[in-house]
Structures are given as structure tokens and as C-alpha cells.
Amino acid sequence: MDTPFDLPPSCESRPGPAIALYPGTFDPITNGHIDIIRRGLCLFDRILVTVAVNDQKTPLFSLAERCALINECFPDLDDRISVGATDGLIVQYARQHGARAIIRGLRAISDFDYEFQLALMNRRLERSVETVFLMTGFRWIYISSTGIKNAARLQGNISGLVPAHVERALVEKFAR
């Protein structure tokens, strides 16, 4: 019988690599996301970057485009980073792919409130998957995909906020 003090299954010894899921809409991926992914690799053997389909958002880039843009960010880390997508529950996707943790980046206290509630719900749904919060690096704390899209749409300078190939893709999207 589970008591509040029983160790969750994620604490038990697991064979194989320590895998974490890093979910998001990534519309588009930013240097802030990349910072979280690279720092996550210091904690986990593999990161599954998971593009989440969110019916409440209308993405600028298609699912395939977002996955391709992410893949292009990590040519040197093919063995440690993989990209997938889901329209289901993230915590179920994590369990199905052997992930022991979900990584979430926090920019501000307002992010924490939402993310904390989400982490508690995920724990209720699947105790074997933990949530790990990583603070966004100071360089990227103000960056959001929405802000970058708005700046790009108005021909603002977004260089240094996203990888060069993402900047080109945004310029191309808004040139149409």
C-alpha cells in the first residue's frame, strides 16, 4: 500500500540510460530552449525533445517544420537528443518512452505557478515520472517564442535570440 512516504517508482534502480523529456510547442525553438536542453544533458543521458500539439494554439510552423528546426539545432548530439511529437498527455508519452523525468524551464515566478500545478497533476497521473525545473539562463529570461514571432513579424532584429536557421525560417514565413 502506498503511503505518502513511499519512494516513487522513479527512485528504484532502472536499467539503461537516464532519459528525460523536454516538451513544448517550440513555435519556434529559441536559444532559451536550447540552453535548457544543453543543461539538461548535464543531468540526463538522453533528452527527448517533444513537440506538443496544443489545440488552444495556432502555430506558425507546422509540426514537421518545428521538428526539423529542432533537429537542425543539434547535429553534434544525435546520439543524446531525439525529437518526437505527441498530441496526448505528456506524462504518458514520457512513460511510454522510458523517460524518468520531464524537464521544464522557468523564466519568472508567473511560469512557476502554472508549471507547479502541471507538475502536481502529472505526479497524480504517473508517479514514476518526476518533474525537474531548470531556471532559464539570465541571457534568455525575457525570451519567448511569442515575443520572437511578434518581433520577426514586424521586421525586428531577432539575431542572437534564435539559431540562424530559425531566424531565416521566420523571415521567410513573414515575407509571404
Give, region by region, the residue ranges found by the protein language model.
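Nucleotidyltransferase catalytic core that binds NTPs
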Residues: 1-176
